[in-house]
Regions:
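P-loop NTP-binding core
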Residues: 2-221
Length: 221
């Protein structure tokens, strides 16, 4: 993957990670404007992360106002963007709390498997706790089903279980992201699903999801 980044002119800045930026925020160090932000050829900006981010979690324990470190950084760049997406690891640690503290709203992706659905309850408790104690404006946009294979009874049972347990009080998006090998290939290729498989089912599903989440965008700006 690093070779592909170099071929796109991104190799030299790949070492500039979210971890570096958060460490600077924790220590009150200033960074050059736009530090670490990669301008992708498909028209979006990306701030990458790697395994070093795990070490940040340990460092956050002893930091004053540790829940707001990510929010402090996002404040410095938010005027430049209409939307900022924070992609979290499946974890309930301090990094996730930082993301929830910085966010306006949450989309909860859940794979159509038993264990992810089972773990959803703990995540919901974390979200409600953050909303009560840290970020009162935090909203839940909805639950997004991913890697769905509607050909199997198992997927159908998981979807039914999710609707039974959460459908009455949390929005479950009508759009579900189907399972696709072509979609799994995009990470290795370093391109989006719209470039790798623009006419595929996954690309079409994400287009529908965008329409479902933001419509024409007027209510979100």
């Amino acid at each position: 993957i690093r070779d592909r980044l170099r071929s796109r002119g991104l190799g030299d800045v790949y070492k500039r990670q979210v971890a570096t930026i958060l460490h600077c925020e924790m220590n009150g160090l200033e960074l050059p404007e736009g530090y670490g932000i990669l301008h992708h050829e498909e028209g979006i900006d990306i701030l990458p992360a790697n395994i070093e981010l795990s070490g940040v979690e340990v460092s956050l324990v002893n930091v004053m106002s540790r829940e707001y470190v990510l929010k402090q950084f996002i404040k410095t760049i938010s005027p430049e963007y209409d939307y900022i997406l924070i992609d979290n690891m499946p974890s309930l640690g301090m990094l996730t709390v930082n993301a929830l503290a910085a966010a306006d709203s949450v989309i909860i992706p859940v794979m159509a498997h038993y264990l992810p659905v089972k773990g959803l309850e703990q995540l919901m408790q974390t979200i409600y706790k953050v909303r009560k104690q840290i970020n009162r404006k935090l909203q839940i946009d909805g639950i997004l089903l991913t890697m769905v294979d509607r050909r199997t009874n198992f997927s159908k049972e998981i979807i039914e279980l999710l609707h039974d347990n959460y459908g009455e009080y949390i929005n479950i998006f009508k759009t579900a992201i189907p399972f696709s090998i072509r979609a799994a290939e995009t990470s290795a290729e370093g391109v989006s699903i719209y470039k790798h498989d623009p006419k595929g089912r996954v690309a079409e599903a994400y287009k529908k999801l965008v329409e479902e989440v933001i419509g024409d965008g007027s209510e979100r700006k």
